[in-house]
From Swiss-Prot:
Its EC number is 2.8.1.8. It catalyses: [[Fe-S] cluster scaffold protein carrying a second [4Fe-4S](2+) cluster] + N(6)-octanoyl-L-lysyl-[protein] + 2 oxidized [2Fe-2S]-[ferredoxin] + 2 S-adenosyl-L-methionine + 4 H(+) = [[Fe-S] cluster scaffold protein] + N(6)-[(R)-dihydrolipoyl]-L-lysyl-[protein] + 4 Fe(3+) + 2 hydrogen sulfide + 2 5'-deoxyadenosine + 2 L-methionine + 2 reduced [2Fe-2S]-[ferredoxin]. Pathway: Protein modification; protein lipoylation via endogenous pathway; protein N(6)-(lipoyl)lysine from octanoyl-[acyl-carrier-protein]: step 2/2. It comes from Halobacterium salinarum (strain ATCC 700922 / JCM 11081 / NRC-1). It is found in: Cytoplasm. Its main location: cytoplasm. [4Fe-4S] cluster 1 binds at residues 36, 41, 47, 280. InterPro entries: Aldolase_TIM (IPR013785), Elp3/MiaA/NifB-like_rSAM (IPR006638), LIAS_N (IPR031691), Lipoyl_synth (IPR003698), rSAM (IPR007197). This is Lipoyl synthase. Belongs to the radical SAM superfamily. Lipoyl synthase family.
Length: 311
């Protein structure tokens, strides 16, 4: 583990509460995985406890083992297993049982499969939408090795938001990400979704992995040029001694600056930026929900999301 002492602003309350327990039991009963648990997300207690609504969880599809080995990620690598054909229906059933009106789906990378899992991902989206079309579905997808026909399968399934994380600036892609990933490849996925659909696009950047400010600025510009609508920025935290060291703990005020730059200068519809923000951060979901479901203006949706996140 990094020898750097974590600053006070990174300390979180442990997860608890009846809502948290109910969601955990439902997931266990249906043999489902969440990225919240597998990636040791620090916001799990906040999201699952439903502080600002019915609660949310990010379902991780296609198993709990990834075909790639990114140096920041706590998900296990290798030992890939066959897909569970019942998983799409089980996820949809759990969404209904928990009572979610906004669900996030992500997955491990499955480079071992012919379609890299795109068909399985699309079936899960359709299962949820067929049961209740009013549920908003956000998907955080792999890069599918840049194969646009596989990205198109996701688009055709009709999610409300498609996210794909660029993770870090161009110079730090290696050693941060697996060598099969890449800056330009991730940009091309996001650009394709923007060009071929009206679906909202979203991405995430980790800070504290050795990047410089001018590189973050450049990355924001590249993302906006690709048509990305929503961006989140958060602090990288080292999951274990075997993972990438933390280069720097970025002060909350710097995150506030990046939020202003992203929205006011580059014109992102929304930017959630803070030390504990993650790609599926709830404030971002609240923004999208307010725009898509309630028809609020971008400015009003921003205010509502930030007010809820600060309460």
């Amino acid at each position: 583990m990094s020898s750097r002492r974590k600053p006070e602003w990174l300390k979180m309350r442990p997860p608890s509460g009846e809502r948290f327990t109910d969601i955990k039991e439902t997931l266990r009963d249906n043999d489902l995985h969440t990225v919240c648990e597998e990636a040791s997300c620090p916001n799990m207690g906040e999201c699952w406890s439903g502080r600002d609504g019915p609660g949310t969880a990010t379902f991780m599809l296609m198993g709990d083992r990834c075909s790639r080995g990114c140096n920041f990620c706590d998900v296990k690598t290798g030992g890939m297993e066959p897909l569970d054909p019942d998983e799409p229906a089980n996820v949809a059933e759990s969404v209904a049982e928990i009572g979610l009106d906004y669900v996030v789906l992500t997955s491990v990378d499955r480079d071992d499969l012919d379609d890299q899992g795109a068909g399985h991902f699309a079936r899960t989206i359709r299962e949820i939408k067929e049961r209740d079309p009013s549920i908003l579905v956000e998907v955080l997808i792999p890069d599918f090795q840049g194969e646009k026909s596989l990205v198109q399968k996701i688009i055709d399934a009709g999610p409300d938001v498609i996210a794909h994380n660029i993770e870090t600036v161009a110079r730090r892609q290696v050693p941060v990400r697996d060598r099969r990933a890449g800056y330009e490849q991730s940009l091309s996925v996001l650009e394709y979704v923007t060009r071929e659909s009206d679906i909202y696009t979203k991405t995430s950047i980790m800070l504290g992995v050795g990047e410089y400010d001018h590189e973050v600025y450049q990355t924001l510009g590249d993302l906006r040029e690709a048509g990305v609508d929503v961006v989140t920025l958060g602090q990288y935290l080292q999951p274990s001694r075997s993972h990438l060291d933390v280069a720097d703990y970025v002060h909350p005020q710097k995150f506030e600056t990046w939020q202003r730059v992203a929205e006011s200068e580059f014109g992102f519809l929304y930017c959630a930026s803070g030390p504990m923000v993650r790609s599926s951060y709830k404030a971002g979901e609240l923004f999208v929900d307010a725009v898509l479901r309630e028809g609020k203006s971008v400015q009003e949706a921003r205010r509502n999301a930030r007010r809820a996140a600060s309460e």
